[in-house]
Structure formats: structure tokens, C-alpha cells
């Protein structure tokens, strides 16, 4: 697979995929917008503290690799960036809205269970049930031009296996365990994080609106 991203590149692309869907009025993003999204404390694992210089470096590299493109002119006072990672006019990687939501969430948070993914991706796509989440993951794992995700061995005490994207290379699978499954709070925790993410998005929109009114 030709997609081989660093952890920071994965974070930047994940942010652009997310914001393209959740805050289309603020998309494409400026460098400052990408910095804010990359260092966001909600729906990010791990939480990063990237500088503007570090983000600019990643953006320049991704533009050279044709994963992003710059947008300027037409009233834009600053250069902005939009993703060409998937679903671009001349790109080869085509993803459905459900697949975009899962890939973006995996790029932003790493390995997760289907239940966690359903909750955390809900702002980008509303899955009808767990079966739709699992079937979409299996499709991504079985694609002829992929695979793009892999199912990991179940961790001790967990009821669900986790899935991980393969855009940063192969994943070392943890040792499988036959321990009896225990009731886990992962899904509840994911739902709380999804709500926190919505609050953060609303705050960001409000700040943007207030800044616009102040101009």
C-alpha cells in the first residue's frame, strides 16, 4: 500500500477529514486552524502539542505528496489547506461517508473497538447499528486496493476486538487472551468523549462567529 504516514501526518489528515464534515463552514483550514485541530484535547489520542512550525512542515510535506492542496485567492487572506487523501477528483482512494468517518477516527485516536468507533465517529456519520460499523470495518479490511484496517487480537478482559488503520504501516498485534470477558465501560466513555467533542465544536464555531462579528 502506497500510504505510509508518520503519526503527525496521520493526525493532520485525520483533522482535515473530520473538519471537512463537522465544520464545513470553516473548511478548508488555515495553518492556525490545523494547529488548533491537531492539539485538540477531545477525540484525540494521544493529545499533542504541535507548534505552528511543526504543523507547517507536515503540511508542506503532505502537499508535495499530493495528499493535500493549498487554496488561496477569492478573498482568502491566508493560505488554506484541503485534503486530497480520499475522494479527490483524480485520486484513487474512494471512500463512502461511513468509511471516511471510521478512517478519520482511527487516524485521530488509534486502535478502537467497534463500539468506541460508533460513538466517536457519530458527528461525522450516524451508524444505524453495530452491525453497520462492523460490516464497514470488514469491507475496509478486505478491499482489493487495501487492506486499510486490521482487526487486532482481543485484549484481556475485553468483550470486543479493536481495529487499527494501516496508513502508518503494519501493526504489531497484542497477544490474544482467553480470559472471560468482563463488563467494560469503554462504550460509555466513548459516548462521553463524543459529547465533549460536540461541545468543543460548538465553542469553536462560536469563537469563529464572534471573531467574524468583531471584524
UniProtKB/Swiss-Prot annotation:
Pfam families: DUF480. It comes from the Bacteria. SUPFAM superfamilies: Winged helix' DNA-binding domain (SSF46785). InterPro entries: DUF480 (IPR007432), WH-like_DNA-bd_sf (IPR036388), WH_DNA-bd_sf (IPR036390). HAMAP family: UPF0502 (MF_01584). Belongs to the UPF0502 family. This is UPF0502 protein CKO_01995. It comes from Citrobacter koseri (strain ATCC BAA-895 / CDC 4225-83 / SGSC4696).
